[in-house]
Amino acid sequence: MSTIGSPTGNPGHSSPQAFFTDLVIYLSVMFLVREVYFSEIGFIANGLMWSLTTLAVATWRMRARGVSWKDLGLRRPTNYKVALIATVFILGLAPVLVVLFSVMSDQLALVVAPDNSAERAVSRFGDLRGNWLLFLTIIPFIWLESMLEELLDRGVLINWIERMLSNKLFATIFAVIAQAAIFGFRHSHDLSERSITVGLIGLAMGIGYVAFGRNLWPLIAAHCALNTLSMLDRVN
């Protein structure tokens, strides 16, 4: 099991400046590609196009640094019990963080923009209410997107930020927080209830990643489960 302060892989003699350059390229593509939208193919297909484009850039920079997806955690768990615990931990921590934020925002009278994602759901996914055929048609693509987000937001971002900051414990803490903020902002380009909620889910994923051996499969399982529950709620 990797320690919290030790990113996996062998980056060779690459300098922190090299990883900084990689991050500039990577994040630029991650955000700018979302400006390209083909209305003819719908939101899900566009989302996959964005993620696959970012995946291609990530793979390119990983090869330049001598790092593989297996190094970042896309490998069979060495201990399935730990993997299961990690999945349950994430599924438990994510709602706890969201509830804690809700309580704190009420106590501190914080004002953020409301979550309007439900209003956009029909235009993005179609009318799912009572439509099990539509649900079964799109859920495999939702799972694929969930997997891609874990590779890109946890696997790449956490490890690259750590290496940019020379792999100190502070670097890991900062990386987990930074990727969560980026994850939230990428889903809603504002300081809103949705961006904060998604960011807190990303924080739970990041904590689970570094605390349980840096294997991506528990995160992928948890992410798929959360998105499945969200889609089921729209069906019912």
Report residues per predicted region.
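Juxtamembrane membrane-interface segments at transmembrane alpha-helix termini
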Residues: 36-38, 57-67, 86, 207-215, ...
